[in-house]
Amino acid sequence: VGNYGIYCPLCGNELTVREYRVDNGYAQFNKKDTALECVLDNVRSSYNVGSIFRSASAFSVARLFLCGFTPTPDQAKVRKTSLGAEKFVLWSHEPNALQLIQQKKEQGYQIIAIEASLSAQSLLDWSIKSGEQKVLLIFGNEIFGIDPEIRAFSDALLQIPITGDKKSLNVAAAFSISVFYFSSCLS
């Protein structure tokens, strides 16, 4: 137990420590210049939230707003899954997502709801409006999706095109795909 990280927990062999660097060309996203913020509204799974923190850190999301009953990094399960990413992502808990979104719209943010829906436009067909560089992405509950009032208030309802049999993604997977796409559009 005291040697965890030095020896393999399965076989007991000594581990080799190697330097790990990633230079894949995507490191161009500069957190200081990112105008991408995200709302998680009533996401129930602590593990999904932790995974979302990792993706938010990886793709330089400027801020996460954890709304309603969405778990925060104060919970051990969120911290366990985020693997420390919560220390590098600005976040706050906001009890009312609709009020927050209304404020962001007044501040000039384009409000984009991400949800698997028959009425949603494909994410790949979306383009940023000229002069608009601030985007707020909305992600909803794993079972019930985005609150209808929030959906109605959004500037766009987008979905990730899926070609396989299962027509929906886990919210953490959808978050990762969406923030990668929007980060590349906004950079």
Q: Which sequence ranges carry the predicted segments?
A:
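Short functional micro-motifs and their immediate structural scaffolds
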Residues: 2, 16-17
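Residues immediately within or flanking Cys/His clusters that coordinate Zn2+
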Residues: 5
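Short cysteine-rich clusters marking metal-coordination/redox-active sites
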Residues: 8-11
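Cysteine-centered metal-binding/redox modules
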Residues: 21
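RNA substrate-binding interface of SAM-dependent RNA methyltransferases
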Residues: 25-117, 183
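Short amphipathic alpha-helical segments
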Residues: 51-52, 77-79, 124-126, 149-152, ...
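Active-site/ligand-binding-proximal alpha/beta "capping" segment
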Residues: 116-163
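Structured adenosyl-cofactor binding patch, chiefly the S-adenosyl-L-methionine
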Residues: 148-187
